[in-house]
């Protein structure tokens, strides 16, 4: 990306990076906050800030190797300047960049990345080893390379209010061009990155932003109008809203989560979408699950996971993840499967899904569960790898309960 030589933009970038790297802020949230801090920035300014923050977060380890030191709060300007030197850009003649030596940076980059895949592709050693152990080095290396690509913005047409062709036309009238995707009936891809949340089409509830891979999960559950469906880890409701559309607003969806604030957000989104068959339930005790035992035609368990399938979209997670967290999340996944599967009625079904691509979070968890619960049978499963699909990575398994 070409440099925009305005100091206030670089102040915004370095402030955002400090909060992401040293104050545990999520990159997407911090970028949004930074962009809101100066209403005078135009679209090019905002794009420059967002892209630079995402790029430098994504390539953190490689940039550090080229700097010859780890990034710290007091060398963030040097860190950002190093990135632009590696991109072949000429830095502004500012005091903050005076220490940077282009020749040394390029030499260190060559030395440190030539024979070290983890440095070159900017991934922690432990995470590279984990993925290589589970998927095999060749497969994992392709996935790591794909993680470093920029993610497309994909939206899902809200069938309750419009169809894909009409939505394309409405967005085009607002200056936004989109393309369709084969095998994804409701998906549109934006040709250029833009803030679609400001469009009238979004305010009218005609679409939601949702990755193409994620859009397959609600379909995988095979819901029908009139069913009783539980989305047990609903969060802010991306898949809940899709289920409502697939059910044509008929039947009952219980959207559940342990975080009440997420359900509050879901209610707002449901109102905008015209989704009227959703009832939220805050999981604040085991009684909430017990009341629904053996009652649901379908249960969706989109469980918490490592998120290794969505690093392209959330590059800061590479630096926030720990082996301890992944081990704990696997225990949580099994616990959710054990407890929440009780809501499936005889003859009903559940879908277990994650945005991870690790077998230890996916196929292995399903296998363990079925061995302990022979009343459930694996009917179908799907693994989406970002390197093959071009979109986020997901796993989904459809389990049927005996009548």
Describe the predicted segments one by one.
Residues 1-403:
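S-adenosylmethionine
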């Amino acid at each position: 990306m070409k440099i925009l030589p305005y100091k206030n933009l670089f102040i915004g970038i370095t402030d955002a990076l400090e909060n992401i790297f040293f104050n545990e802020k999520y990159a997407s949230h911090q970028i949004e906050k930074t962009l809101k801090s100066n209403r005078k920035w135009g679209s090019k300014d905002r794009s420059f800030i967002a892209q630079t923050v995402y790029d430098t977060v994504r390539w953190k380890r490689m940039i550090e190797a080229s700097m010859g030191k780890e990034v710290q709060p007091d060398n963030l300007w040097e860190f950002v300047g190093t990135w632009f030197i590696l991109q072949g850009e000429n830095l502004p003649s500012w005091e903050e960049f005076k220490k940077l030596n282009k020749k040394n940076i390029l030499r260190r980059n060559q030395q440190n990345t030539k024979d070290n895949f983890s440095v070159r592709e900017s991934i922690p050693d432990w995470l590279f080893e984990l993925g290589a152990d589970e998927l095999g080095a060749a497969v994992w290396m392709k996935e790591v390379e794909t993680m470093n690509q920029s993610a497309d913005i994909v939206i899902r047409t809200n069938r309750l209010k419009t169809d894909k062709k009409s939505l394309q036309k409405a967005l085009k009238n607002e200056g936004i061009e989109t393309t369709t995707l084969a095998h994804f009936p409701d998906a549109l891809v934006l040709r250029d990155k833009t803030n679609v949340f400001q469009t009238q089409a979004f305010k009218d509830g005609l679409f939601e932003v949702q990755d193409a891979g994620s859009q397959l999960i609600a379909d995988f559950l095979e819901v029908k109008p009139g069913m009783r469906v539980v989305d047990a880890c609903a969060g802010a409701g991306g898949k809940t809203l899709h289920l409502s559309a697939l059910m044509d607003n008929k039947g009952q969806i219980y959207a559940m989560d342990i975080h009440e604030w997420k359900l509050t957000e879901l209610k707002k989104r449901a109102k905008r979408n015209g989704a009227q068959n959703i009832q939220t339930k805050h999981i604040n005790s085991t009684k909430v699950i017990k009341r629904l035992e053996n009652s649901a035609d379908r249960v969706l368990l989109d469980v918490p996971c490592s998120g290794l399938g969505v690093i392209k979209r959330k590059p800061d997670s590479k630096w926030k993840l720990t082996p301890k967290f992944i081990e704990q999340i696997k225990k949580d996944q099994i616990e959710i499967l054990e407890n929440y599967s009780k809501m499936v009625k005889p003859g009903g079904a559940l879908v277990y899904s994650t945005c991870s691509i690790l077998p230890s979070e996916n196929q292995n968890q399903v296998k363990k569960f079925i061995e302990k619960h022979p009343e459930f049978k694996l009917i179908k499963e799907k693994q989406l790898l970002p390197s093959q699909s071009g979109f986020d990575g997901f796993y989904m398994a459809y389990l049927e309960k005996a009548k």
